[in-house]
């Protein structure tokens, strides 16, 4: 490759490396595959990504991704507004919904605390969570973070945040494997963890 083509190829590899669990070798293989065999699909991927960047935003209530002001769950008036489940990422909402074990509402942190990567309290949208709690009918908050070092650190910060607020606070039971991310937990185990959630504090300030 000449220098310009090499720069373009290396830029593509660099862009692919931002994806989760994609290292330099995987990114290089993906780049070769897209350019050599899947050019039409690559163009469709670029178009889909550009469309998503233009149209997808954060739900005004729960902070997940949606198109428009509210996501489908927040707009559903049949949901139980008394229970708010706090999760790490939108994938956790999808997994919990698939397990059919929570008919309340959600708040998506869009991050978790990871001191090794310099991700502190600012990574978990506490300001937006505080806004979500204003003027609502919420009675119980369910902390649904993973049982990893990052998830436990996030759960601790959340429990401290809720300590002096008038809500019953609970956390998923440890039926979820230690070190397990909710995204990869089967529906039965996840449902059991929700139903057997552990009380952190009773309602009342």
Curated annotation (Swiss-Prot):
Residue ranges of domain Toprim in the record: 82-177
CDD domains (alphabetical): TOPRIM_recR
Zinc finger C4-type: from-to: 59-74
Keyword Glycosyltransferase listed: no
GO annotation (BP), single: DNA recombination
InterPro entries: DNA_Rcmb_RecR, Rcmb_RecR, Rcmb_RecR_Znf, TOPRIM_dom, TOPRIM_RecR
Signal peptide stretch: none
Pfam families membership: RecR_C, RecR_HhH, RecR_ZnF, Toprim_4
GO molecular function list: DNA binding; zinc ion binding
Keywords: DNA damage, DNA recombination, DNA repair, Metal-binding, Zinc, Zinc-finger
PANTHER family per the UniProt record, alphabetical: RECOMBINATION PROTEIN RECR
Family label: Belongs to the RecR family.
Biological role stated in the UniProt entry: May play a role in DNA repair. It seems to be involved in an RecBC-independent recombinational process of DNA repair. It may act with RecF and RecO.
UniProt xrefs under NCBIfam families: recR
Entries under HAMAP family matching the protein: RecR (MF_00017)
Protein name: Recombination protein RecR
Encoding gene, per UniProt annotation: recR
């Amino acid at each position: 490759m000449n220098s310009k083509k090499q720069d373009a190829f290396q830029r593509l590899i660099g862009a692919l490396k931002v994806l989760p669990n994609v290292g330099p070798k995987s990114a290089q293989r993906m780049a070769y595959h897209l350019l050599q065999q899947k050019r039409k699909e690559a163009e469709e991927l670029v178009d889909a990504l550009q469309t998503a960047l233009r149209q997808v935003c954060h739900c005004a209530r729960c902070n997940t991704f949606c198109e428009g002001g509210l996501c489908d769950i927040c707009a559903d008036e049949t949901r139980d507004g008394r229970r708010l489940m706090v999760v790490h990422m939108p994938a956790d909402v999808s997994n919990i919904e698939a397990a059919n074990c929570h008919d309340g509402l959600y708040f998506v942190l869009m991050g978790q605390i990871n001191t090794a990567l310099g991700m502190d309290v600012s990574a978990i949208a506490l300001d937006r969570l505080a806004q979500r709690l204003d003027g609502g009918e919420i009675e119980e908050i369910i902390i649904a973070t993973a049982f990893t070092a990052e998830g436990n650190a996030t759960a601790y910060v959340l429990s401290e945040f809720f300590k002096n607020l008038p809500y019953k606070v609970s956390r998923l039971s440890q039926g979820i494997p230690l070190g397990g991310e909710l995204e990869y937990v089967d529906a039965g185990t996840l449902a059991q963890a929700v139903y057997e959630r552990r009380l952190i504090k009773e309602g009342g300030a």
